[in-house]
Amino acid sequence: SHTFLHFDTIAVYENFWILFFLLGLYLINKKWPLSSGLYMLAIFSKAFIFVFFIPTIFYIYRSEISFRKKVWTICSYVAAALLIFVIFSFGDTIYDDIILVNDSEFFLALNTLGYTLRYDVLIILSLLPLTIGLFFVSRRGILQADSILVLILTSLLAGPIISMLTDFYFVLPYRFLPLIVFVAIGIGVIFSKKD
């Protein structure tokens, strides 16, 4: 992927927010108490990741862990989100002054997706077959397929949502790194031998 090669191989763009978020998703299945802490680290690395809060809750709901662990994990994420909200609301951050809801910005930002992803032809061409493949894999009973579909959709709509809610952020190419990672994970889910 052109975007991954450009923004992940140079030191100017830090990508710890993606690393912390993906490790948090992984740890939901392995060691759930640590996952919400990594989500907090991802938020403090780049506040852009807050858009993925609801898809993360959906991922927890669809994960293959016990009901009790799901409840505790969701509670820990809600507590982490409340703690982050309190820290941002009491601190002098730039995030207080930039909230400005403008619904026309959503459609303008949605229009720029083609321009932003113009060099990632493989990602664009794989989205439709991947969506259809994940749908059929989901019908076979693999729960992760639904979660990956929601995460891919969120990755596509995160930029327009941020543009609609703020007057500060725009659709920038490095914000599509999670999309590239989730497309790769989705391809792995389709070709996995697990039934």
Residue ranges and their predicted role:
Residues 1-3, 15-22:
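Membrane-embedded helix bundles of polyisoprenyl
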Residues 6-14:
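Short acidic/glycine- and proline-prone juxtamembrane loop motifs at membrane-interface regions
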Residues 14-17, 51, 170-195:
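Hydrophobic/aromatic-rich transmembrane helices and adjacent perimembrane loops
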Residues 21-34:
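Membrane-interface transmembrane helices that cradle and orient dolichyl/undecaprenyl
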Residues 50-79:
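Perimembrane helix-loop-helix junctions
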Residues 97-119:
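Juxtamembrane membrane-water interface segments that cap and precede transmembrane helices
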Residues 122-146, 160:
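Hydrophobic, aromatic-rich transmembrane alpha-helices
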Residues 143-165:
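Transmembrane alpha-helix segments characteristic
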